[in-house]
Swiss-Prot record:
GO terms for molecular function: alpha-1,4-glucan glucosyltransferase (ADP-glucose donor) activity; alpha-1,4-glucan glucosyltransferase (UDP-glucose donor) activity. GO terms for biological process: glycogen biosynthetic process. It comes from Geobacter metallireducens (strain ATCC 53774 / DSM 7210 / GS-15). GO terms for cellular component: cytosol. Transmembrane segments: none annotated. ADP-alpha-D-glucose binds at residue 15. It is an enzyme of class 2 (transferase). Its EC number is 2.4.1.21. Pathway: Glycan biosynthesis; glycogen biosynthesis. This is Glycogen synthase 2. Synthesizes alpha-1,4-glucan chains using ADP-glucose.
Amino acid sequence: MKILQVASEVAPLAKTGGLADVVAALPKELRRMGHDVRVAIPFYKEVSSGNLPVRKARKSAEVALGGELHKGYLRQTALGEVPVYLVENRDLFGRDHLYGPPEGDYPDNPLRFAFFCRSVLQFLKRMDFRPDVIHCHDWQSALIPIILKYELGHDPFFNRTAVIFTIHNLAYQGVFPADALAQTGLDPSLFSVDRIEFYGRINLLKGAILAADAITTVSETYCHEILSPGQGCGLEGVLERRQADLAGILNGLDSEEWNPSLDRRIFRNYSSKSLAGKGADKRELQRELGLKAGASIPIIGMVGRIVEQKGIDLVIDLLPRFAAEELQLVILGTGDLRLMHQLHEFRNKGVKNVSINLGFKEPLAPKIYAGCDMFLMPSRFEPCGLSQLIALSYGTVPIVRRTGGLADTVIDVTANPREGNGFSFTEFSADACWDAVQRALAAYRDREGWRKIMRRGMLRDVSWRSAAGKYEELYRTCADNRRG
């Protein structure tokens, strides 16, 4: 099949979160399965300053939006054997950030991503590349299913193209004031309750949910959770309307990038058969971060965005308890300025067993996964989560809140001693989180039992093979339905 993946980021070209990893790994696996898979993202400033060679494809697009004509150019590079198309417009994408500075999003984001989506559709025609499936990711690509259904529904070039739309995080919906409609180029008739209108505003994610041939989320549990008012973010009714076309497909992990037996970024390689190298990684992490050396001191790691979704506010409340325990805590991340300020204030107290590293330092992340004994993810909600998959692969036992993809991948040792690969808690509270930490610390004292827990996690297949097979099946079903 011919498949185009459309997203706002792909690793390592442009990345702010897990979306970029998915859009890098899924096409690679589909390519191995014999499909003609390509990727389209904007040509951001950070892409142009990267190391991959980028060539101009001598194709241009013109899009009228907001009363102005915007011109774009097509550039091309590749990630392995996967071609990557880059939509260039320096005014719109030649900026320092993908979506906006720390203070907030760029106000013209609806125009920026409308231009991107419309340019992609123009370039497909100019290249004469007719995808069987266009797979769109998150609100930044939401205009593609909307345009194909309501504007180009009778266009012979696209009438056999199925559109899959994946929700990576329902909290980000592409909601804008009603007067931003002109920036999208959509007909005003689409500003209605059964199209893109949402409480007097534009909601691009809603429009994509209603327009796509099929909708997926990134784990089975999250797929069920978003049908409830608690996690539906106001769209539970819309999702319920499309429930027959909604599926949860658990993300995989790129086992070429994240493999402790091959990873060149860590101090010493190791595997489930030979764990000795993990001890060396622990010693090196302690040395690098100025922590007290000691093989018997448990280290708990956290890597990710410093935002309330990730439960970092629980961890901040628990910092005095962590500081008083015979353990070490390592935090790496960047995000919400208020939460980062609270972490900075605690760091200034000079607590010796807590290492807080603000700002995302890419080389440190794999060292934390390899060098820690446990990995903490107390998320409020977690559509899928990649960090716990990495932790499992690296023998770093996850401690998680039982939600979304965390519930689908981490089996609690307390509830299931024979198959457990981590520790979990249900209630979103500091005490419930601390109870799970204490259960993990108690299990850690049984060294042989702990190694069994580590190995169970490392032996779990978290690769993209299974997920790619499910996507392939969905693609075929939707493409066949399109052909009639």
